[in-house]
Amino acid sequence: MIKWPWKVQESAHQTALPWQEALSIPLLTCLTEQEQSKLVTLAERFLQQKRLVPLQGFELNSLRSCRIALLFCLPVLELGLEWLDSFHEVLIYPAPFVVDDEWEDDIGLVHNQRIVQSGQSWQQGPIVLNWLDIQDSFDASGFNLIIHEVAHKLDTRNGDRASGVPFIPLREVAGWEHDLHAAMNNIQEEIELVGENAASIDAYAASDPAECFAVLSEYFFSAPELFAPRFPSLWQRFCQFYQQDPLQRLHHANDTDSFSATNVH
């Protein structure tokens, strides 16, 4: 029998959080009861350690907080919450937000412009998100804003900047880089053939290695059936790094559903 952490008797000063309702989003329904219980335990600690800051009138309630915490903890379900120790605040806008962006061109000229962002991950600072795109991250579509920004945080544990190579054994770095760049080239070839909007993988993955790792991390957890057969070698590297196999999890859940359906009287 599973002992759900949120069903343990709490002190009179605590209010029970709606973990069971929070787990009902499509992305998390494939997890086993043991995995869901472990995820909730991590998410409870996440909410104790991190500060969720609503901005521009966004209203943050307990259900929203729980779902945000669950999505943050899914990538580190087996790695451990200490992998998220490089930030302490999550800033949440109600919708995509405008920021001042500074960039340098090929001849060294610095340009400034205002751009619309869905999210940001500062190297030694907070993660910035928006609720509209968080809501769009609840399904299994290949898009997940929170997992994308978490991947950047995991990436920077390996050095001063995001490189697309997370903290893995040194002997595995060359193979990881080879497979990641091969995936980028493959995605770019598809973009050139069918266009960005028709590409089966988000075109942002072809922009640089750090974004490729972040985008493919989204697909790893929310659309494994697209990632695994297309990039099998890189898929195995992701499974080894995250210590999870979402495709196997999905197949097991589908088999369980099929078995249940055939035994309905």
Curated annotation (Swiss-Prot):
Disulfide bonds: none annotated. Zn(2+) binds at H111, H148, H152, E211. It comes from Escherichia coli O1:K1 / APEC. This is Mlc titration factor A. GO terms for biological process: proteolysis. Interacts with Mlc. Signal peptide: none annotated. Involved in the modulation of the activity of the glucose-phosphotransferase system (glucose-PTS). Interacts with the transcriptional repressor Mlc, preventing its interaction with DNA and leading to the modulation of expression of genes regulated by Mlc, including ptsG, which encodes the PTS system glucose-specific EIICB component. Shows zinc-dependent metallopeptidase activity. Its main location: cytoplasm. The gene is mtfA. Its EC number is 3.4.11.-. PANTHER family: MTFA PEPTIDASE (PTHR30164), PROTEIN MTFA (PTHR30164:SF2). InterPro entries: MetalloPept_cat_dom_sf, MtfA_enterob, MtfA_fam, MtfA_N. It is found in: Cytoplasm. Its cofactor is Zn(2+). It is an enzyme of class 3 (hydrolase). Pfam families: Peptidase_M90 (PF06167).
